[in-house]
Amino acid sequence: MSYSFTEKKRIRKSFAKRASVLDVPFLLATQIDSYTEFLQLGTPLDERKDVGLQAAFKSIFPIVSHNGYARLDFAHYVLGEPPFDVQECQLRGITFAAPLRARIRLTIFDKESSKPVVKEVRENEVYMGEIPLMTANGSFIINGTERVIVSQLHRSPGVFFEHDRGKTHSSGKLLFSARVIPYRGSWLDFEFDPKDLLYFRIDRRRKMPVTILLKALGYTNEEILSEFYSFDTFYLTKSGVFMRVVPERLKGEVAKFDIVAADGKLIVAKDKRITAKHIRDIQTAELDRIEVPADALLGKMLAHNVVNQNTGEVIARANEEVTEEILAKLALAEVEQVEVLFTNDLDQGAYISQTLRTDDIQDQTQARVAIYRMMRPGEPPTEDAVEALFQRLFFSDETYDLSRVGRMKFSSRTYQYKFDDKTPEWFKTLIGEKFASRRDVMEGTLATEDIVSVIAILTELRNGRGEVDDIDHLGNRRVRSVGELAENQFRAGLVRVERAVKERLNQAESDNLMPHDLINAKPVSAAIKEFFGSSQLSQFMDQTNPLSEITHKRRVSALGPGGLTRERAGFEVRDVHPTHYGRVCPIETPEGPNIGLINSLSVYARTNEFGFLETPYRKVVDGKVTNEIDYLSAIEEGRYVIAQANAELDGEGALIDELVTCREKGETILATPDRVQYMDVATGQVVSVAASLIPFLEHDDANRALMGANMQRQAVPCLRPEKAFVGTGIERSVAVDSGTTVVARRGGVVDYVDAGRVVVRVNDEEATAGEVGVDIYNLTKFTRSNQNTNINQRPVVKVGDHIARGDVVADGASTDLGELALGQNMTIAFMPWNGYNYEDSILISEKLVAEDRYTSIHIEELSVVARDTKLGPEEITRDIPNLSERMAGRLDESGIVYIGAEVEAGDVLVGKVTPKGETQLTPEEKLLRAIFGEKASDVKDTSLRVPTGTVGTVIDVQVFTREGIERDKRAQSIIDAELKRYRLDLNDQLRIFDNDAFSRIERLIVGKAANGGPKRLAKGTVIDQEYLAGLPTKHDWFDIRMADEDIAKQLELIKESLAQKREEFDLKFEDKKRKLTQGDELPPGVQKMVKVYLAVKRRLQAGDKMAGRHGNKGVVSRILPVEDMPYMGDGRPVDIVLNPLGVPSRMNIGQILEVHLGWAAKGIGERINRMVREQSAAEIRAYLERIYNETGKPEEIAALSDAEVMQLAQNLSKGMTFATPVFDGAKEAEIKHMLDLAYPDGDELTEKMGFNESKTQMTLFDGRSGEAFDRKVTVGVMHYLKLHHLVDDKMHARSTGPYSLVTQQPLGGKAQFGGQRFGEMEVWALEAYGAAYTLQEMLTVKSDDVTGRTKVYENIVKGEHKIDAGMPESFNVLVKEIRSLGLDMDLERY
């Protein structure tokens, strides 16, 4: 394998036993692909597919006027260029969006003509609002903040059959139901009640007998019965009553009479159960009819109306029960043959028949009126309204759409039903023959056949045949991603537009209107704005570190519009389902009320065209595993036998074991190799990105692994990120895919590097012809993330480095050499230490604080606005009343703080004064005013000050001024500095382009013949370096006339390219200047806005929360001086002391294995460090060969040059880097082998350490006394994180502050500057102690006794330390509450 430029610098030693068949896919593909498909930006207009915006437009257009004489057609849409780029949008607080324009054609028809004749056609582009664009990293900038649209996991449209699990009725009877769920439109439910009657409901309204729906669809009673039942035929003759024999129907029945063969032989005696043998005997005897007792017909249901052939009179109606009276009438009318319904109690229930009997509606019209009354109670049912409503319910494209997915699911569940020998004939006839043509239909509306087939399958379920659906199966739940969600919103906006347009279309001709006059795009842009700005699925991006970004974009939520609600979701929905395997992570989900409702996609999962989740598998042919990969959805997976990724294979890829552990239909089985059809692609296929970053995950309890996965997302980026010694091998993919690192777009040579920019000269073969090949990467410096953490990129390349496409050029936050680095590698000892690690507390060494190991920078944005008030405009100024000289000294003449100023709580950042209301002046004040002019008493100080508890440095200031208001000096200087920087940037780029172009020309023309040129160059002269150097400027090179036509053409191309670049740069500069100098869009009434950015340095301190990657979290309890920390045999103190009791009960043993392997990594690193100083490259190479290739996955160390080996050794000298992939990690023996390589027996250092036999524990010494501890201690290195729960953000104190308006009690929480709640139980405590006065002040003056509060303040000012407690305000609230109930309550003072 070949290593990339950054991989070469530090190769991770992997312990994987199985080579990877499939690389980790691009982790943001779901989001980016979905939105790309929605916009179809790069697709030619005529090749656009019917999805996204195109589908939304096509579903609404054409719009026809009510009178039919005007029509609007949609031709195509185009998206313009966004006016501002991503950074500018973030800075200005606006949305990163592009204008959408649609080409609309208005056709007007001639009213006079009998046929539709086109009178005129008008066409133009109509502005349809702005569509937010996705950034390269899969997020959106909405109003200046970065947001993510989370994918939604919702119930797929289609038909679902289920039962209530016996919970509805007290008897525990299973009540079956079916539900047809469209993508949009009314839901149709069918349900059995405890009496076995079948009902339907529309949109969960009142239930009605299902036969009403069938009659509304045009069925008569006879047709209903003939669809859902097989018939028994009885012959009424003079000699007796005979029944036609259908042997299959008799099986399992109890014979109500003797069944006798033609020869008189008894086949079945009366009251005996008919068995399969009896059936065979009947078939052998070839009985086609048997005589039955005269009363055998009693109680049966008639299948048809029975008519007297002579008189035409109806004797009995269909579905009527045969009684003695009806039998007499039949005999009288000489009816010879009667058909009755074949029903029994076992497997052919009379449910439809019974339901039909409860329904007294006669015809189609009545049935439709009944449905209308149920849907629109209280409205008079006119014929047109009834008809229109019924059509719009399920049969109209406009209001009902199953969608492609819904139709596919519907057809596969109903029309592709698998019959067996127990399936009744009526069902086979109905589904298998009558409706067979419906299998391939793809229409979005329902048809009569669809509804009938659902009822048929539901009755079959009640008859005991078929299976109900599992609604938690991922074949019945699908993912709606950004594109689809945005399309639905866009369509909803267009529907509103359509209503308005239809009204105006009638006037289109008379008023001579154009398409843009007819269409108002406000509803569309409002719908889109509302969705991106405030939908439940549009979330403020979690940007704490790269992992939290990537996880947020890969999240799937069952909540949101059209999904579940937290309160109503049961255990089944939240639970892990067998179909989650490889699709949704079983580990990563939040703790708390959302558990199981918010999930994360597994690493290899993707969505298919229908939105169902798929996971990849390797194909297995005849017990041999191939490298062919198929993606299977949960529905398809059920058909196969799938082996796990850790199944043993031989060298040829054949399965070795006689029985292989496999999965089939959600169950784990043991199968022979020849039965296996697929195999997992990777061991970590089951889990998500966050879970697959946990080394030794297989040794952790699931609950702790969940915490570990969640807490990695809260890790704060450290000042100097450090790679994890023990990783899992996926760190590089996460860092690169998250977009935090800068990745080379094309290969080439690094030309220039500084802290803010990397310039790469592109390889000739990757540069397009005539293009000047230079890539410039501007790095992000000290930028604020959504969570106030610091985003800062640092270059990892040097001038002259050769890099390839996809190589990491610069590291970002929490990345180290292109790998994710969330925490620091700490030397950890598991031992108690004087109670300071009781209950998961963490004891840390002062060294960590001194070395800034866990120091992080947080950037806070503080803003102030100057408004136009009723009393006059607010002013941003330096002249603030009563401002001390020290504070004013930090402000410039515009009243804004200088960059670089170190400020603390209470300091003024931006001076601002607000006009005060006019007050009555005393004559003395009037006199003073007249003498000394206007005084500052007219204004009050409303300056922006540093909030409490904050100390930091001002790193940036931005000033925004409304159009038409003059900028102050500070704003102007910021613009000038920005333009200067930009001009410098462009000049540098131009210089590099020039140099690159001329070096290409040099390579092109040196040694070639010329036809002439400057300095009287003779024809045929071969150009050399000397001649070129002698020309006055390099631009004179273009005047050389080359003999070779091709070279001359290339010269001309380069000249044009350079001129084009110059022009392009001038335009860029002008564009930038225009953007900067134009006024800013500010909210109404705001004249000016100033944003100040403070960088706050947060060092590790007691009270901060820390955690490992195995859910082993704790709070720092004490920072101990280095000299007091326990130390090892060679004198080195440990960094952190953890409580060993935190491991056994939590069952996260992964941390112990990590500690040991980490210790080996550190030992190997120290060993390499010594070798780099003392030994040759050959010896280092030999040692590295041993580390990399004695166990686990081999690496090609031999392929590296000596220089590369030395650089690798240099990078490993702090510690070796290991990868133990999830479920395929290092075994105990391998860890011990690594420990032996790090600390060989007989080595001086090994002796000093005082190891036990397995080198897993050592003797530690107490730093205070120097004595050895009684027992050996487990010491090692663990990657430990500092989490975003910092004590500085939580610590808070209040003396006086705001009160609640109604209760007058102090508010709660730090944000409100609230108090600490003294609750019911705390009151009990004071009561128990008898602390009466303390209790009194808690309940009165410290809480809601308003007069008492002010009195206490007065007393303190006077120096009298006493309280006068009065009536608590909450008591008054209680009195008012009681009075509101009509109870007059008076208070009497005693």
Swiss-Prot record:
Transmembrane segments: none annotated. GO terms for molecular function: DNA binding; DNA-directed RNA polymerase activity; ribonucleoside binding. It holds the Pfam family RNA_pol_Rpb2_45. It is an enzyme of class 2 (transferase). Keywords: DNA-directed RNA polymerase, Nucleotidyltransferase, Transcription, Transferase. InterPro entries: DNA-dir_RNA_pol_bsu_ext_1_sf, DNA-dir_RNA_pol_bsu_external_1, DNA-dir_RNA_pol_su2, DNA-dir_RNAP_su2_dom, DNA-dir_RNAP_su2_hyb_sf, RNA_pol_bsu_bac, RNA_pol_bsu_CS, RNA_pol_bsu_protrusion. One of its GO terms (cellular component) is DNA-directed RNA polymerase complex. Gene3D superfamilies: 2.40.50.100, 2.40.50.150, 3.90.1100.10, DNA-directed RNA polymerase, beta subunit, external 1 domain (2.30.150.10), DNA-directed RNA polymerase, subunit 2, domain 6 (2.40.270.10), RNA polymerase alpha subunit dimerisation domain (3.90.1800.10), RNA polymerase Rpb2, domain 2 (3.90.1110.10). Its EC number is 2.7.7.6. It catalyses: RNA(n) + a ribonucleoside 5'-triphosphate = RNA(n+1) + diphosphate. It comes from the Bacteria. DNA-dependent RNA polymerase catalyzes the transcription of DNA into RNA using the four ribonucleoside triphosphates as substrates. The RNAP catalytic core consists of 2 alpha, 1 beta, 1 beta' and 1 omega subunit. When a sigma factor is associated with the core the holoenzyme is formed, which can initiate transcription. Belongs to the RNA polymerase beta chain family. This is DNA-directed RNA polymerase subunit beta. The lineage of its organism: Bacteria, Pseudomonadati, Pseudomonadota, Betaproteobacteria, Neisseriales. The gene is rpoB.
